[in-house]
Amino acid sequence: MYEKFDLKKVEKGIIRGYLWHVENPDKVVCIVHGIGEYGGRFDRVAKEFNRENIAVLALDLRGHGDSIEKKGHCAPRREVLEDVSALLEYARQKYPGRRIVLYGHSMGGNITLDYRAGGRLNDRPCGYIISAPWIRLVRPVPKPLYALVKLMAKIAPQMTISSSVDERILGNPLTVKPYSENPMVHNRISALCAVDGFEIGLGLEDGSHEDNGKAAKIPTIIMHGSADRICSVEGSRRIAKRLVEKGDAVEYVEWEGLYHEIHNGNDSSTGEEVIAKMVQWVKAL
């Protein structure tokens, strides 16, 4: 079971952290969760890492779980990246000398790719796991609606709308559990958070949101389920292809028939094969 801690104190409150501790770990994994969820939802995944002597940390992003901000307001992106940096620094202080991997799922995958690409922060990890990243959506937002959201991001950035996440298309019901009944989970996203995600996703895909070359040699694995009905698998295919073609150390794995939460599988899988792949990938670094 995890223990909670105060990762970072800011003017409005705190950023909550989670720790799945093991003594003298071989490696450390830091998790960035997706929209509407919270760090503790990765308990099942973290325990599998722990079994292989890998310590795990996570955070509640702004607007999520026990952290500050209105529900769904995971913005501005600059501050979100600073929170991720704080998580990595906490891991370094807790486990000095250990190799650290940054693992982001869904919106967390978008944020983690942004962190990888930005070149703005010097504390890069030794590897990246990108799970079903928000690069583009399966159902694109209509242009008139997106224009309105962009306007609201400027004049009322904390205004929220429904993220419309249906628990039935996330993964296996036995592992997803009663998603809508969990009080730590919500279905809100703010205008600024949405625009940040869409704009950065497009830039990551076409290369306009590019890095300064420092990330090219850092091992990165991008994984996506072919049956994802939330974040389009095509976005992952395209960004992986682009990065491989320019010589980055990127591996792409597509899981046939798995849903959005690939670590939770689909109706006939609990995602154990995905978790095993991640564990072995981290161990091999």
Can you annotate each of these PLM segments?
Residues 232-243:
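Short alpha-helix in the alpha/beta-hydrolase fold that links the catalytic acid
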Residues 36-38, 65-95, 268-274:
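Catalytic nucleophile-loop/oxyanion-hole region of alpha/beta-hydrolase
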Residues 251-285:
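Catalytic active-site module of serine/aspartate enzymes centered on a nucleophile-bearing elbow/loop
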Residues 46-70:
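Conserved alpha/beta-hydrolase
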Residues 1-24:
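N-terminal cap/lid segment of alpha/beta-hydrolase-fold proteins
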Residues 26, 34-37, 226:
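Active-site glycine-rich loops that stabilize anionic/oxyanionic intermediates
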Residues 216, 222-224, 228:
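Short beta-strand/loop motif that positions the catalytic acidic residue
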Residues 107-190:
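Alpha/beta-hydrolase-fold enzymes
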